[in-house]
Amino acid sequence: MKTLLLTLVVVAIVCLDLGYTLTCLICPEKDCQKVHTCRNEEKICVKRSYDKNQLGWRAQRGCAVSCPKAKPNETVQCCSTDKCNK
């Protein structure tokens, strides 16, 4: 009986997907504090920085499924821990 109960608990945990959900920063400011909870399939935080002509460097932050490739005049930083895309 105990074995059956233990098996049911394990199956319930696997089926419910009680996994970890990543949180990333999502604002363009340098001192960004706005946090976003990523979707289950998004396991990476991204910060894309690019030159905005005479306005200086700008950044985009958010969640991603995979780390994007950098475009010309752009840097991309990817990480996989909470709020790591500062």
Curated annotation (Swiss-Prot):
Classification via InterPro entries: Snake_3FTx, Snake_toxin-like_sf, Snake_toxin_con_site, Toxin_cobra-type
Disulfide bonds: C24-C45, C27-C32, C38-C63, C67-C78, C79-C84
CDD domains the UniProt entry points to: TFP_snake_toxin (cd00206)
Entry keyword annotation includes Repressor: no
GO CC terms of this entry: extracellular region
Tissue/organ expression: Expressed by the venom gland.
Single annotated GO MF: ion channel regulator activity
Localization terms from the record: Secreted
A Pfam family per the record: Toxin_cobra-type
Record's keyword annotation contains RNA-binding: no
Family note: Belongs to the three-finger toxin family. Ancestral subfamily. Orphan group II sub-subfamily.
Protein task: Binds with low affinity to muscular (alpha-1-beta-1-delta-epsilon/CHRNA1-CHRNB1-CHRND-CHRNE) and very low affinity to neuronal (alpha-7/CHRNA7) nicotinic acetylcholine receptor (nAChR).
Protein name stated in the entry: Weak toxin 2
Lineage: Eukaryota, Metazoa, Chordata, Craniata, Vertebrata
